[in-house]
UniProtKB/Swiss-Prot annotation:
ANK repeats lie at residues 48-76, 80-109, 112-143, 170-199, 203-233, 239-268, 270-299, 303-333, 337-366. Pfam families: Ank_2. It comes from Rickettsia felis (strain ATCC VR-1525 / URRWXCal2) (Rickettsia azadi). Keywords: ANK repeat, Repeat. It comes from the Bacteria. PROSITE patterns: ANK_REP_REGION, ANK_REPEAT. InterPro entries: Ankyrin_rpt, Ankyrin_rpt-contain_sf, Multifunctional_ANK_Repeat. Transmembrane segments: none annotated. The keyword Repeat applies. This is Putative ankyrin repeat protein RF_1306.
């Protein structure tokens, strides 16, 4: 059994609760509860590392909880890292939750950034959510960039969603309001003044979108640099940095269009990366723009795949695939696995590409077809 973040209280703070029940009562009730648990599983208490307080909370005996609670066990964790408060929440026991919170109870820190209120949302107890919202601390965004409203919506908790909607409507930060009104100058000013936001949160993505739409290069560069924190970007250009971003929530295709307006051309490696992003976004306009600036659609990657191969793999639309067919010298070129575009289209069940390639005169062949043909001529 371990503890964390123990709340320091004046010694007398707990005294009134330790006197709430006679010692004999505490001993007899615990003995009875432990015996009841042992009948189901004799090793449960030991294996789960339950403290007496865990047992009392699990049994929903508030009088016993009040008698046992002290600053040493209030945030003790069991074998599954659950504190008494977490058990009370999962047990849907609002009165015990209120008592433990008043005594300084918390749930153990976790890798997802979730707090007590997330558990209350999970069990769909709106009254408990309302209490924890007003009386406990929690992060605005979890590890995945979700707000409490997002979490409730994902869990299908309609009444709780409405509660958060009302709260959020009245408690938006200046940065959120500036983003909503698409006031780019206010957004920049607030960020310069230190307004905090998670770059990979819903708000962060909205700011990114606003920066791209306004073509504000300084804000775009700031956001790109923060997106790539921890990566060695060295002396790379902004366009080279963007080529390293792989986040479906950022409209990279639109961003590249903004950045290449004044670019006369690209080196092969960068051009290939940008072309692949355009292809996987199924953005014909960007592919055409890159092609007009000298990006070679036939440039092969490490797997020997051309732009046409990637378009088929991404199951792109008819217009983009047709464009690449028309701008590919050898539509029967095989990648290193031996597949040519038609073979790849068939193996990926890409009917559009299959139809267009057959109309263009493509044939399906594998790496060793020519060898087999030659051997056949010699009677093997």
């Amino acid at each position: 059994m371990t503890t964390f973040n123990t709340v320091t209280r004046h010694p007398n703070y707990y005294t009134s609760y330790t006197k709430i029940a006679p010692k004999d009562y505490i001993i007899s009730r615990l003995k009875a509860l432990k015996a009841k648990i042992a009948k189901v599983n004799p090793m449960a208490i030991r294996d789960n590392k339950w403290s007496d307080l865990h047992i009392a909370v699990g049994a929903k005996e508030l009088k016993l909880v009040k008698a046992l609670c002290n600053e040493k066990n209030i945030n003790a964790t069991d074998a599954k890292c659950r504190t008494p408060l977490e058990l009370a929440i999962l047990g849907n026991d609002l009165e015990t939750v209120k008592f433990l919170v008043q005594m300084g109870g918390k749930i153990a820190p976790n890798m997802y950034g979730w707090s007590a209120i997330h558990l209350a949302i999970k069990i769909d107890n709106v009254e408990m959510v309302e209490y924890l919202y007003e009386n406990t601390e929690f992060q605005k965004y979890d590890k995945y960039g979700y707000t409490l409203h997002d979490w409730a919506e994902a869990m299908g908790r309609g009444e709780i969603v409405r509660f958060f909607h009302d709260k959020n409507h009245n408690n938006k930060t200046p940065l959120e309001l500036a983003v909503e009104s698409k006031n780019i100058s206010s957004v920049k000013a607030l960020i310069i003044k230190g307004a905090k936001f998670d770059i990979k949160s819903e708000l962060g993505y909205k700011i990114f979108e606003l920066a791209i739409d306004s073509e504000d290069m300084k804000l775009i560069e700031y956001l790109v640099n923060h997106t790539l924190v921890g990566k060695n970007t060295g002396q790379q250009t902004l366009l080279e940095k963007v080529a390293q971003i792989y986040d479906k929530n950022i409209n990279l295709s639109k961003l590249v269009k903004v950045l290449i307006k004044d670019n006369a051309g690209f080196d092969k490696a960068l051009g290939q990366k940008l072309l692949q992003k355009a292809i996987y976004a199924d953005d014909l306009e960007l592919v055409e723009t890159l092609y007009s600036k000298g990006v070679d659609a036939q440039y092969k990657d490490q797997l020997g795949r051309s732009g046409l191969h990637h378009a088929i793999k991404a199951n792109c639309g008819e217009e983009l695939i047709q464009f690449l067919i028309e701008h590919t010298t050898d539509i029967n070129y095989r990648d290193k696995s031996g597949l040519n575009p038609l073979g790849l289209a068939k193996s990926n069940n890409c009917t559009v590409a299959t139809k267009l390639l057959l109309e263009a005169g493509a044939y399906e062949s594998y790496m060793y077809d020519d060898v087999i043909k030659v051997l056949g001529e010699y009677g093997y």
